[in-house]
Amino acid sequence: MDLGTTKYIIYTELIADGYVEKHDVIGAIFGQTEGLLSNELDLRDLQKSGRIGRIDVDLENINGKSFAKITLPSSLDKVETSILAATLETIDRVGPCFATVKITEVEDIRVSKRQYITNRARSILRKLMDEMIDTYEITEEIKESLRTEEIMEYGPENLPCGPNVVHSDSIIVVEGRADVLNLLRCGIKNTVAVEGTSVPKSIMELTKKKTTTAFTDGDRGGELILKELLQTCDIDYVARAPYGKEVEGTSKKEIMKCLRSKVPVEQIVGNTCNDACNVSKVIEDTPKEIFEPVTHKYYEKVETPVIEPVFEGPVVEEEIVVVEPVKKTETEIIDVDATNEIQADRKFSGVKEIVDSIKNTGNVKFVVDGTEKTNTFKEFLTNIHEIKKMDFFAADMPISQKIVDLLYDKTPIIVGKEINVTKKPVNLRLFSFDEIVA
C-alpha cells in the first residue's frame, strides 16, 4: 500500500453471514454509502481526486461465513476522516448476505512517522557522538604521542627511560617500558626500567650515583623484582603500587600517593628482602608524620667507639672529660670511652635477657613504667603516638637515623642489631647487640 500523502488509515472488520467475494465487499462499500453524505464526501469522487486511496480487502470464507479486513487510506482532515469511518459502519448487506461492519482503529500516519523520525534521529546522533572526537581527546592524543616520543634509551642494554634520567639527582626504577610510559603520562620523567628480574649492570652503577626509589607492582612479580633490586642495587626508598595492581595500570592520583608515601629502606622491618616486600602494608599502616625528618638542636657527631683491650685485673674506670662552656650554660658531658657506657648500661636490670629474647625474631621490646612489652615493628609504629616515655627500647633490626629521630625524646637508651647513625642527641645512648652481650 502506497501511503503517499495519506494522513490516516481506517481499519475495518466485516463479517457476512454467507459466502461472498472481494468484489461484493467493494461494491457494498461504494453502493451503500452513496448519497448518504454530501458530494464532497462521496467515496467515488474522493477516490478520483486522490483524497482517499485504494481500498484493500483481505477476505476469508470459513464454515459458510465470510470474514474481511478492510483498510482505507485517507488524506482528509481529522473530522472528515471520522465521518467517513462512521459511514462505513452503516453497511448491513454484502451481496445477498447480511453483514456487520466495525471500525477497529483509525491510525494517524503522522504519529508513526514522527516516532520513526525520533528513533532514527536518536540512532544517527548516537553514531555521530561515538565517531566525534572532542577537543580534550584531541589534546590527550597529541600529548600521548609526544610522551611516546619522549621515551629514550639508557646504557648498552638500551633500557627504556625518561628524558631526565641522566641529568636528574634522583631516579625511579620500574619494571618495564609500559611503566615508564605511564609515569610519563603523569609528568614524571626521571624513570628507568630494568626490563625483567635480572638487573642490568648499568642500573647497578646508576643507583650508586643517584638517590634511587624502587617503584614495583603490587603483586608477586613486583616482590621478586624488589628482592633483586635490594640485593644488587643501592636503593634509598621503596614504593609499591596498590595491592594487586601494576604500575602501568595505576592512575595518576594513585601513583602520586604511592610516591609521596615511599619508605626509606632503613624503615623496612628487619634487614631481609622478605620484610622489604611488605613495605606497601607498612606504608598504609604508618602515620605520615613518623617519616618526617626531625631536627634537634642538641645533636653531636657519633665517632666510631674505640674499644681498649681488656686485661685481667681490677677494672679501672677512665676519667670522664667535662667540657666547660665559655658562657654559663648547662654542662655538656661526653664520654670518651664507649666501653664505660656499656658497663654503665649493664646495670640496667635484665638488658641482656631482653636482647636475647628478641634475637632473630624481628620484634621490638620496650619498657614503659617498669613493664616490658613486645611488638612487631609495624605494631610499634602504629601505636607510637600513645607512648609518651619509655625506660628502654630494643629492636632486632639495625638502628637507623630515622629511628633515632623518632625516639630521641621518648627513651634514654636504644639497643639494636647494628648502629647506623651519623648523629645523635647527647642525652641518648646507643648500643648494638654485640656490645650488650660482650
UniProtKB/Swiss-Prot annotation:
GO cellular component, alphabetical, reads: cytoplasm; DNA-directed RNA polymerase complex; exosome (RNase complex); primosome complex
The protein depicted here goes by the name: DNA primase DnaG
Assembly state and interactors?
Answer: Forms a ternary complex with MCM helicase and DNA.
Briefly, what is this protein's role?
A: RNA polymerase that catalyzes the synthesis of short RNA molecules used as primers for DNA polymerase during DNA replication.
Keywords for this protein: DNA replication, DNA-directed RNA polymerase, Magnesium, Metal-binding, Nucleotidyltransferase, Primosome, Transcription, Transferase
Q: Entry's InterPro entries?
A: DnaG_primase, Primase_DnaG_arc, TOPRIM_DnaG/twinkle, TOPRIM_dom
Residues bound to Mg(2+) 2: D217, D219
Gene Ontology terms: biological process: DNA replication, synthesis of primer
Q: Which SMART domains match?
A: TOPRIM
Organism listed in the record = Methanococcus maripaludis (strain C5 / ATCC BAA-1333)
Cofactor section: Mg(2+)
Q: Which PROSITE patterns match?
A: TOPRIM (PS50880)
Q: Where is the signal peptide?
A: none
- GO MF annotations in UniProt: DNA-directed RNA polymerase activity; metal ion binding; poly(A) binding
Give the catalytic activity.
ssDNA + n NTP = ssDNA/pppN(pN)n-1 hybrid + (n-1) diphosphate
Pfam family example for this protein?
A: Toprim_4
Which lineage is the organism of this entry classified under, starting from the top rank? Archaea, Methanobacteriati, Methanobacteriota, Methanomada group, Methanococci
Which family does the record claim for this protein?
Belongs to the archaeal DnaG primase family.
Residues forming the Toprim domain are 169-243
Cofactor notes: Binds two Mg(2+) per subunit.
